[in-house]
Amino acid sequence: MKTFASLLYLKMSSAATAAATATAATATATAAISVPKRLNYIGSKFQLLDWITSTMNTKTGLFDRGRDGSTGSARSSGSSVVTFADIFAGTGIVSYHFRTKYGAKVISNDAELYSSIITHAFTCSVYNNKCKSVIAMLCAELEAKRYVSGVGVGFVTRNYSPYEGNERMFFTVDNAQRIDYVRKRLEEFKVQSGDGGGGVGLSDDEYKFILASILISADNVSNVPAVYGCYLKKFKAKAIRPFIIEPIHKHTKPCVAGSRTYCSDVLSSAFLSDAAFAGTDITYIDPPYNERQYSKNYFPLNIIAKPPQQLVSMSEAPVLKGKTGIPVDCFISPFCKRGGGVCEAAFDKLFRELKTKWIFLSYNSESILPKEKMLEIMGRYGVASVEECDYKRFKSFKYNGDLEIKEYLFCLRKS
């Protein structure tokens, strides 16, 4: 059995290691603000990060620029670190922003499995030598076509590619096999080298970093217009490119102690009563804006996120339905419900029970609840206000309508 060290693709001498360490130390600020990989995502806040941060700081005074003007520092009282909760994390880009640029302790969550894994990589994981080496090994095995001759045929290939006459075209057969293969191999790498599975022993942070990198890389070769509610009838150029794994980010500085990630319904009693949220400085809420359920728009990513052994288990394998093969047990969010007071009741419960000093909520002029109603609900639990900015509408290919909408950032200072 080869040891992990013998499998490393990039070997450095002691002198080179010392030089690399010194270089990394001087480049921390640059690495912290490097642009990470991210999903093509409905409602991504990547383009709004500066506006959101500036508005939060104007309201709370919690975020100040570093003395050198290059990176920010976060402080709640005196020199203590700000605790920032991002409970509808989605792409994880907001969590990553406040972790890397402002040094916040981040507590993130999303009800979708794929999102919670990606967000964990952004909230807690670092890009270390083991992550780098395993990704390099997986890419080398793909280059050597280790996945062919049936080795890479798994759940994704059988159900979401045109394999053996299947009509679904979310991925090419070749890319689906590549995805299935690396998912299986990642589970093998996860175990300790002495356990007989040929693994290298990955920590939870390392495992989720690599899995998140697989998810982002799979999304980059998907054959969809924007989301996975449908697939294209012909493979576009992006989908034909061979699937390879690129690291989701290259941040090397450890997260603040106490940072963590959940995969939970935000309205569950267990989540709302979790002691980790007690005394949180800021809770940022970026809920669904309309009736589109994220579980139905990104379901293949949830499939890829699951351990392959679950997908072949009679008791755990998802039951698929319809032309697209959507799982029947998709999570249904009450924040997507129009009518019947369901959405309003969900927000009311959330604002009432969150143990936090400040709540900031992103919404827009086309969301389920109008601006006035949201201010009314928030006002039941403290002082509420809203800031606005013009923003371009999300579109997949073409949209014949207004190109700009009003983006809202609501603020609640809890009583």
Task: Go through each PLM region and give its residues.
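Conserved acidic residues
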Residues: 265
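Class I S-adenosyl-L-methionine-dependent methyltransferase module
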Residues: 105-107, 111-251, 295-341, 345-346
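Intrinsically disordered, low-complexity terminal tails and inter-domain linkers enriched
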Residues: 14-32, 62-80, 191-200
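Short conserved loop adjoining the S-adenosyl-L-methionine
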Residues: 268-277
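S-adenosyl-L-methionine
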Residues: 2-15, 29-64, 82-85
